[in-house]
Amino acid sequence: MDRTVHSFVERLGIPREDLLLPCTFCSRFLTQEELTAFDFSAFNLVWRGRCAHGICTACARVCASLDLFLHHQNSRPLADVLRDENLTLHGLKARCRVCMKILSVTEKLECAERGESFAKVRGQWRARCRICKPV
């Protein structure tokens, strides 16, 4: 079973524009921009029977918000996270707390520079990406 939109359309031998991928939560078909964002965010396709499903941008944001609200464990500055978890900046896996995109090393540093704490949610670290950062 394919895990990415890219590998799925390659296996099917169809152009990305022809793919109709429903959202797991709202059943709306993802737009071309959302298909790109899906792979960019490193999400995995969900398979129900022989049908693949993704997640639209709106539902990803709602899921991120609910996850943070319902499953927040603690929040700490980046330096504390790296020290306590015995990780390097490259070894720290973190997603955006708003859109769920995987944070780059630069984005992790930008969070620390802004003084933003990293939130532990269901055992995973979250902070804001450069697109979702507070203005």
Swiss-Prot record:
The keyword rRNA processing does not apply. It comes from the Viruses. One of its GO terms (molecular function) is zinc ion binding. Keywords: Activator, DNA-binding, Early protein, Host cytoplasm, Host nucleus, Host-virus interaction, Inhibition of host innate immune response by virus, Metal-binding, Modulation of host cell apoptosis by virus, Transcription, Transcription regulation, Viral immunoevasion, Zinc, Zinc-finger. InterPro entries: E6 (IPR001334), E6_sf (IPR038575). It is found in: Host cytoplasm; Host nucleus. One of its GO terms (biological process) is symbiont-mediated perturbation of host apoptosis. The keyword Hydrolase does not apply. GO terms for cellular component: host cell cytoplasm; host cell nucleus. A zinc finger (unnamed) spans 23-59, 96-132. Gene3D superfamilies: E6 early regulatory protein. It holds the Pfam family E6. Forms homodimers. Interacts with ubiquitin-protein ligase UBE3A/E6-AP; this interaction stimulates UBE3A ubiquitin activity. Interacts with host BAK1. Belongs to the papillomaviridae E6 protein family. Plays a major role in the induction and maintenance of cellular transformation. E6 associates with host UBE3A/E6-AP ubiquitin-protein ligase and modulates its activity. Protects host keratinocytes from apoptosis by mediating the degradation of host BAK1. May also inhibit host immune response. This is Protein E6.
